[in-house]
Amino acid sequence: MKPVRMTRRGLLMAGGAAWAAQNKPHGVRFGVRSPLPKASLRERAMLVRRAGYDGIELGPEWLNQPVEAIQQQLAGTGAAVSAIVGSIELLDTDPVKRAAAVELDRQRLRMAKQLGADCVIEVPVFGPNKFQDLSPLMTAREVEEKLLVAGLKQLTGDVERTGITLLLEPCNHKETHFMNRQSQAAEIIDAVGAPGFRTLSDFYHMQLEEKDIGETLSRYGKYTAYVHLADGVKRTEPGSLPFDYRPGFRALKKWGYAGWLTVESGATDNPEAALGRALAYLKRQWSEA
């Protein structure tokens, strides 16, 4: 049998995936969504680690480059990749764009696996509804729900093969007309009816949309596989305002939550100092919940 020769690209991918698989700890981990807007990915990852966090979430600005380029930038920083974003056009009115969104999600699921990430984050659409109301046959919302479920069902095989969780993220009504609450995401997941589809519970959006975050997560926390954190309507770092995360954390603990707690916010002052304070605050709130 001839020996298999592996390229440098293959070594990077295989090594990164193996390291990630062997070094995923049990219990919650703390992450940050791409701090320092003008910094390089490496600088951001190093900042996250200096502030005491376990990893970094990657937005779309980093994902149009080869996986090995991302791995090279993160090499030696000690920062894990918690999640990456997926498409935002699964509910576009153009069927060509919807098909392209499904294909992009397939690519992102593979990329997430190569980077050792746990999840791909999906916001189906931003902005107002653009579909026609087809009543009495079907309302515009029912059209959207059926299209979204159909699009997600096309990804069930990819989710199963990669082992990556596809997250549905409910956003507040100022950002999207569709899927604003945890219950709505849960309904979509139930309609898809396949493992590997879960919700992202964003405390910033929930502050604006849910009457009681603790009660909401007591009911729907079983769907939660990832968490975003920020304080108040200005979306500042946790601990900058007197916001109590403990009721929500307590509900998540009852469901056995052991995923990422990721800060997605601005900073009230020096980013490293602000993130350090936020981490101390979140660890204290989690332990007290």
Language-model regions, residue ranges each:
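Short catalytic-loop micro-motif centered on adjacent basic/acidic residues
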Residues: 31-32, 55-59, 168-169, 200-202, ...
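Active-site-proximal loop/turn and secondary-structure-junction residues that shape catalytic pockets
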Residues: 36-38, 62, 87-90, 126-128, ...
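N-terminal substrate-binding region of glycoside hydrolase catalytic domains
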Residues: 47-65, 85-90, 96, 100
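Active-site acidic/histidine proton-transfer and metal-coordination neighborhood
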Residues: 15-22, 97-198
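Histidine-acidic metal/acid-base catalytic patches
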Residues: 2-6, 10-30, 38-49, 116-118, ...
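Active-site mouth loops of central-metabolism enzymes
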Residues: 28-40, 90-102, 138-144
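Active-site-adjacent beta->alpha loops and helix N-cap segments on the catalytic face
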Residues: 64-73
